Amino acid sequence: MIYAGILAGGIGSRMGNVPLPKQFLDLDGKPILVHTVEKFLLTSEFDKIFIATPQKWISHTKDTLRKHHITDDRIEVVQGGSDRNETIMNIISAAEKENGISDDDVIITHDAVRPFLTRRIIKENIESVLKYGAVDTVITATDTIITSADGDSIQSIPVRSEMYQGQTPQSFNVNLLRNSYNDLSDEDKQIMTDACKILVVAGKQVKLVMGELYNIKITTPYDLKVANSIIKGGMLSD
């Protein structure tokens, strides 16, 4: 089975004084979440598309999908967790409850507030995760990256040609991710916010798929303005 897991657990705190979580904010006439879901619906390979959202927003999510005529039987809205990785585990649990989990099942996880992913990115994630078991979507870093442990002085300046910026989707063999997550201590689960890092720490190979510069995550008012400009400027591709 090939699962999609759309992570809509954010509350939009960096958006400022807004009445709704950021995934429900309007982008060119419809909620950001709807743009994202529509991209996944174009991919016939998905057997199931899970949308994970806070419990208090489940009804609103379902109403939003109905309002925008999204009625595909593959979609299921489930309750998210207290953090990103717990949310992914909740999706996996929902999938297991319905169908069980087999050794070759994979999940393509994606931020609900990255509405500009392309069919190419999805397709390459599916192909790569089926072959390698773990995939991250990235773009090359264009700015010099600086590390600083104390936030006051430079600790190191890595070679820029070896630096990448992480995006989503992040895609995994379900059992590989779940087993690696379950092997973590409770303390590590609290501090390890990136699913790919779980596998890297476990010594597993994570392959790279190239993303797109415009595959942005909309988390601030500035991001929302940029997103509207991307649409109006016709910068998108398939």
UniProtKB/Swiss-Prot annotation:
Residues annotated for CTP binding in this entry: L7, A8, G9, G10, G81, S82, D83, R84, N85, E86, T87
Enzyme nomenclature, EC number: 2.7.7.40
Keyword line: Cell wall biogenesis/degradation, Nucleotidyltransferase, Teichoic acid biosynthesis, Transferase
InterPro entries: IspD/TarI (IPR034683), IspD/TarI_cytidylyltransf_bact (IPR050088), ISPD_synthase_CS (IPR018294), Nucleotide-diphossugar_trans (IPR029044), TarI (IPR034709)
UniProt-listed SUPFAM superfamilies: Nucleotide-diphospho-sugar transferases
Site-annotated residues for Transition state stabilizer: R14, K22
A single GO molecular function term of this UniProt record: D-ribitol-5-phosphate cytidylyltransferase activity
A Pfam cross-reference name: IspD
Keyword presence, Cell wall biogenesis/degradation: yes
Pathway(s) of this molecule: Cell wall biogenesis; poly(ribitol phosphate) teichoic acid biosynthesis
Reaction(s) the record says it catalyses: D-ribitol 5-phosphate + CTP + H(+) = CDP-L-ribitol + diphosphate
Site keyed Positions ribitol 5-phosphate for the nucleophilic attack: positions: R160, K217
GO BP term, pick one: cell wall organization
Protein family: Belongs to the IspD/TarI cytidylyltransferase family. TarI subfamily.
PANTHER family in the cross-refs: 2-C-METHYL-D-ERYTHRITOL 4-PHOSPHATE CYTIDYLYLTRANSFERASE, CHLOROPLASTIC, RIBITOL-5-PHOSPHATE CYTIDYLYLTRANSFERASE
HAMAP family from the UniProt entry: TarI
Function: Catalyzes the transfer of the cytidylyl group of CTP to D-ribitol 5-phosphate.
Name of the molecule in the record: Ribitol-5-phosphate cytidylyltransferase
Gene: tarI
